[in-house]
């Protein structure tokens, strides 16, 4: 029953990671609801607070939320529904319930790109966001963002102008227009795209809700594009989450003299993929979605409107602003981000391989040996070596820094 899903999704003291663990032990939330203390106590990671939350069997609040959803025409998507995005389900802390308005796209059938950046964007950043949002939408991709002023909203506006698919992920209930002055965009996204939130209707924006929703933006996406972000930007949190989830991180290069570009430029230094068009982003996924992507030219005059530039310039710090990234936020990404290579894979004979591999660790040598006969898919190397994804990506980063391997389009790697 939906009431049990709502009850489970909003259990106090139960983390999203623990909810995913519980779903592995029980068939559905109804079984969890009827589980007694003895059945719950033996589960791993179960804290006292979580146990207390799970032993509270009152469904009144859940029934009230369901009534509000009916009244406000909010739809519910549960973790076990067929339409629940597979990419989102595979993150460590997926939301158990999503509330949405509008048309939910088939996330798994299309390449999805999260576009994020600063609220107080420059005219350059806003124009780039609008162009890339337009290009991704026009070429067949889904644009996911946060519906905020600045980069987020402008990118979504570009996707809507292209007639593309766009999804706004909120840090409040899906029935709340936030910020209020973004009402026109909110209504357009609701009408032509989708408004989505894990928070129950009526939940106000708060300082903790925005960082929490960022994992959904990255989790829904094949890759995250950072258009413009200062050093202490919430967009860097989304980029870090994307890297931890195994997503690509793309960055639009910014002016080195503009503070709002400092954080995004640092991502490039740490290995993010430099792009200057939406097609450069989508081309990374052309092999995965060959029938869904088409290259389209962008109108020459696709620029941010004076109203968008003015709104970003006048934007004041929000009382519920995202938790700022730590000073080391970008440097922590260095071991996780993939670098982009424009070279094409080609089998090569490495006559000096043994000499080049001297001094490498055992795991580094194992990976290099797998690439002796040419480029390989990352998934194939994982299967052959038995290394975990996280371990492999970390070793690949070190091999790149040592000049041993290079990344190729289509999730391939090869010896240099």
Language-model region placement:
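Glycine-biased, small-residue-rich flexible motifs in mid-sequence functional cores and linkers
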Residues: 1, 70, 79-416
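Short, small/acidic-rich helices and loops at N termini and domain boundaries
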Residues: 1-82, 404, 411
């Amino acid at each position: 029953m939906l009431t049990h899903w709502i009850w489970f999704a909003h259990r106090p003291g139960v983390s999203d990671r623990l909810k995913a663990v519980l779903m592995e032990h029980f068939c559905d939330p109804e079984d969890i609801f009827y589980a007694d203390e003895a059945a719950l106590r033996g589960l791993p990671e179960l804290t006292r607070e979580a146990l207390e939350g799970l032993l509270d069997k009152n469904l009144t609040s859940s029934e009230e939320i369901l009534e509000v959803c009916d009244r406000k025409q909010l739809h519910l998507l549960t973790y076990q529904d067929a339409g629940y995005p597979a990419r989102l389900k595979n993150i460590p802390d997926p939301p158990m319930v999503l509330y949405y308005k509008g048309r939910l796209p088939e996330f798994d059938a299309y390449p999805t790109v999260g576009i994020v950046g600063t609220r107080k964007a420059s005219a350059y950043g806003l124009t780039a966001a609008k162009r890339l949002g337009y290009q991704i939408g026009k070429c067949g991709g889904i644009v996911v963002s946060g519906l905020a002023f600045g980069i987020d909203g402008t990118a979504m506006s570009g996707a809507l102008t292209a007639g593309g698919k766009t999804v706004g992920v909120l840090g409040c209930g899906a029935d709340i227009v936030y910020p209020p002055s973004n009402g026109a965009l909110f209504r357009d996204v609701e009408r032509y795209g989708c408004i989505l939130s894990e928070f129950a209707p009526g939940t106000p924006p708060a300082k903790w809700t925005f960082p929490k929703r960022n994992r959904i933006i990255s989790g829904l996406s094949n890759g995250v594009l950072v258009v413009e972000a200062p050093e202490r930007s919430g967009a860097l949190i989304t980029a870090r989450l994307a890297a931890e989830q195994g997503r690509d991180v793309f960055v639009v290069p910014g002016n080195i003299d503009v503070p709002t570009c400092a954080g995004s430029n640092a991502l490039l230094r740490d290995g993010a993929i430099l792009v200057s068009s939406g097609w450069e982003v989508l081309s990374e996924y052309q092999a995965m979605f060959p029938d869904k992507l088409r290259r389209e030219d962008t109108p020459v005059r696709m620029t941010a409107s004076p109203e968008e530039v003015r709104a970003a310039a006048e934007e004041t710090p929000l009382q519920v602003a995202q938790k700022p990234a730590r000073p080391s936020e970008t440097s922590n990404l260095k071991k996780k981000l993939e670098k982009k290579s424009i070279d094409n894979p080609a089998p090569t004979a490495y006559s000096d391989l043994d000499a080049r591999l001297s001094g490498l660790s055992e795991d580094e040598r194992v990976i290099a040996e797998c690439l002796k006969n040419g480029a390989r898919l990352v998934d194939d190397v994982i299967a052959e070596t038995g290394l975990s994804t996280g371990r492999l990506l970390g070793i690949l980063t070190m091999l790149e820094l040592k000049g041993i391997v290079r990344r190729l389009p289509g999730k391939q790697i090869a010896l240099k």
